[in-house]
């Protein structure tokens, strides 16, 4: 039993983890190895890292209605260097891929909407930035309780890599909001039929 627990500690960790503080790993990141990251970089894919300390509330089932569900606050960090790379990509019309729902929530929490003026609120629905494109601001340990549900306007993230999630979870609501409900239902039905693995150590999907 101790051997299994020790092995799990190694397996339940991304190769790029640096800062302690989360109660769970960003499981979409478990699919990435050092060699895969090196291969992506060799293909001139920009790989940037952000931090969001996942709290236990993320996994709290939706008890009543989707609309009334609340998320607990979680601390997150986006360096100025990373924000600059993302903003340059947005300016150039490049696509931003988020690895995991935690990354998406952090980026959308720090999003500033491109418009004529203003500084933005950093909640995903900010005022204008003075640019013709959406941007993300640097964040140093602020908290977010952003709950992504149908109707959310995605300002930064264009594509998402994510695992298959539990029913009645805020994570599944986020995924269905990012794609659309019918597409996600179809994907999950196919995953069940083909016996894909679900949850933390499971398979992942790419939503373009």
Residue ranges and their predicted role:
Residues 1-118, 130-208:
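Surface-exposed, charge/polar-rich loops and edge strands
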Residues 124-130:
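Compositionally biased low-complexity segments enriched in histidine and/or tyrosine
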């Amino acid at each position: 039993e101790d051997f299994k627990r020790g092995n799990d500690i190694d397996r339940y960790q991304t190769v790029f983890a640096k800062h302690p503080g989360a109660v769970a790993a960003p499981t979409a990141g478990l699919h990435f190895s050092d060699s895969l990251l090196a291969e992506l970089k060799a293909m001139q894919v920009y790989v940037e890292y952000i931090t969001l300390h996942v709290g236990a509330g993320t996994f709290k089932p939706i008890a009543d209605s989707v609309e009334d569900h609340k998320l607990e606050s979680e601390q997150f960090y986006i360096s100025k260097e990373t924000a600059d790379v993302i903003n340059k990509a947005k300016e150039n019309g490049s696509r931003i891929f988020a690895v995991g729902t935690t990354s998406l929530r952090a980026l959308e929490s720090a999003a500033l909407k491109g418009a004529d003026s203003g500084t933005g609120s950093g909640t995903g629905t900010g005022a204008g930035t003075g640019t013709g494109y959406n941007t993300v601001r640097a964040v140093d340990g602020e908290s977010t309780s952003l709950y992504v549900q149908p109707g959310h306007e995605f300002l930064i993230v264009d594509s998402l890599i994510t695992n298959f999630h539990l029913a009645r979870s805020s994570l599944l609501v986020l995924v269905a909001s990012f794609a659309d409900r019918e597409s996600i239902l179809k994907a999950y039905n196919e995953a069940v039929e083909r016996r894909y693995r679900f949850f933390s150590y499971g398979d992942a999907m790419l939503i373009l």
